[in-house]
Amino acid sequence: MDNLEEPLAVGRTAEIYPFGDGKVLKLFFPTIPQAWIDKEVETGRYIQDAGLPVPKVYETVRRDGRAGVVYERIEGPSLLNQLGTKPWNVVRYARLLAGLHAQVHDVSAPPGLETQHEWATGGIPESAKLPEDLRDRILRLLASMPEGEQLCHGDFHPGNIIVTQRGPVIIDWMTAY
């Protein structure tokens, strides 16, 4: 594919382009660290193998000096869009969202992903916005919590659920832990 069409979507980290039959190219902005992209690819392959309803990861590519990932193209509206156009189905959609969330948490996080404790405590020690006593209290509370091994999406909301003919599909795993 030499020339890319107009993007299907533009997010905070990337643009999504049609990329041949049944595929899309998630082309990351140059400011996105390669380590984040590698993590998304590794996590995507892991959760795909775990049987979660996610887009298939095909390959990584470089286009015009930018890193990209070729994914299965997922067709359909987001669950957020469905909520906006069919609000009378809110209870059904809430149950769907809860069921998907439970499915995600039934999977152990892949090796090498940041743990939930590491993620939760990440920026607290350096936060200038928190008073020191509150910062210390939060860190003590987090340290007292049991370690967890469950996969966490990190950005799980109705906008990251695509409703397809084959069922709901969970997208955007960059912030998983």
Can you describe what each PLM-predicted range is?
Residues 106-154, 164-165:
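An alpha-helical support segment within catalytic cores of ATP-dependent transferases
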Residues 65-78:
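Conserved short submotifs of the Hanks-type protein kinase catalytic core
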Residues 80-114:
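Conserved kinase catalytic-core helix
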Residues 150, 164-177:
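Active-site Asp-x-Gly
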Residues 56-67:
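Short beta-strand micro-motifs within the conserved protein kinase catalytic domain, predominantly
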Residues 35-50:
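The N-lobe alphaC helix and its flanking beta3-alphaC-beta4 segment of protein kinase-like domains
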Residues 10-37:
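ATP-binding glycine-rich loop module of kinase domains
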